[in-house]
């Protein structure tokens, strides 16, 4: 990580007198990197920021080594949103959109009507997990809250917001019974935490530090705030991966593709717009066992 001030991080907190944990996320530089790759309309900027924040919060609830992929799809003006977040806290994202169909005040239902979001966990070791989030809430916060209640059967409340410069998120989640084992007490305790979490305003999340937000919400509770976990924008594309894609076609088809493309194949990364060019000599070298001219899988 750099020596610049921390603007991109997650931060856990815990209630000492309740079976509840929480997590907050702040995104600025990584959010700006994602938005800089394409000319996104403002409503799409907001959706991307909220989904980035959601990905960071979700990884905080999981214990795995690997990759979390969020893909929202619809038949509306925004047919695709995609976020990838690794257990090393690297994040990247993109959206596809029809700009002429997007109004400045468009909301989730306008942008992605009838949409759904697929959540995929790809561990380094172990089986892939996939879950589905219906985009039938008023906003992404409500959609993800419903997902946890319906699919994971865990009391969870999520608040997400983004303004094109900053993206923020707050998650509170009930833990297994340790402090309040009585069912009624346990439900009352959760209801208290959730009710206060639901009062947080977008301007508070965007404009205040985490400690201040938590004090405003839970000043009567014993809350411990842990150290931050920095995160960053990092794209996993590389010349080596692009080379492997060509090799997977087979030598005959790869050489035919070069000819069809006028002598040079261009492979573009949709996430970061990096371009990788391969001419006939490059392709011949790949199949001669010469490898690529970039020996390692450089990421940026």
Swiss-Prot record:
Disulfide bonds: 235-237, 269-272
Keyword Endoplasmic reticulum found: no
Family of the protein in this entry: Belongs to the HSP33 family.
GO cellular component: cytoplasm
The entry's keywords: Chaperone, Cytoplasm, Disulfide bond, Redox-active center, Stress response, Zinc
Biological process annotations from GO: protein refolding
A Pfam family this chain is assigned to: HSP33
Position of the signal peptide: none
Protein name: 33 kDa chaperonin
Entry's transmembrane regions: none
Function, in words: Redox regulated molecular chaperone. Protects both thermally unfolding and oxidatively damaged proteins from irreversible aggregation. Plays an important role in the bacterial defense system toward oxidative stress.
PTM text: Under oxidizing conditions two disulfide bonds are formed involving the reactive cysteines. Under reducing conditions zinc is bound to the reactive cysteines and the protein is inactive.
Matches recorded under CDD domains: Hsp33
Entries under HAMAP family matching the protein: HslO
């Amino acid at each position: 990580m750099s020596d610049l001030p921390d603007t991109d991080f997650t931060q856990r907190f815990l209630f000492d007198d309740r079976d509840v944990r929480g997590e907050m996320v702040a995104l600025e530089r990584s959010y700006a990197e994602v938005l800089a790759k394409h000319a996104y309309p403002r409503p799409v900027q907001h959706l991307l920021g909220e989904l980035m924040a959601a990905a960071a919060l979700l990884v905080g609830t999981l214990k795995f080594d690997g990759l979390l992929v969020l893909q929202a799809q619809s038949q509306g003006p925004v047919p695709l949103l995609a976020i990838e977040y690794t257990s090393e806290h690297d994040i990247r994202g993109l959206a596809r959109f029809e700009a002429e169909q997007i109004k400045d005040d468009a909301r989730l239902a306008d942008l992605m009507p009838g949409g759904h979001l697929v959540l995929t966990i790809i561990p380094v070791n172990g089986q892939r997990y996939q879950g589905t989030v219906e985009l039938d809430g008023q906003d992404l916060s409500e959609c993800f809250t419903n997902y946890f209640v319906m699919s994971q059967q865990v009391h969870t409340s999520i608040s997400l917001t983004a303004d094109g410069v900053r993206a923020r998120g707050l998650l509170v989640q009930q833990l297994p019974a340790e402090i309040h084992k009585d069912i009624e007490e346990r439900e009352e305790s959760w209801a208290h935490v959730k009710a206060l979490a639901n009062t947080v305003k977008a301007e508070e999340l965007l404009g205040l530090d985490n400690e201040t937000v938590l004090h405003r919400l839970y000043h009567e509770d014993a809350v411990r705030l842990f150290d931050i976990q920095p995160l960053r924008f990092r794209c996993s594309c590389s010349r080596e991966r692009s080379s492997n894609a060509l090799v997977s076609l087979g030598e005959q088809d790869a050489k035919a593709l070069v000819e069809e493309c006028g002598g040079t194949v261009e492979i573009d990364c949709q996430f970061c717009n990096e371009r990788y060019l391969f001419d006939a000599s490059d392709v011949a070298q790949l199949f001669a066992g010469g490898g690529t001219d970039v020996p390692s899988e450089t990421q940026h």
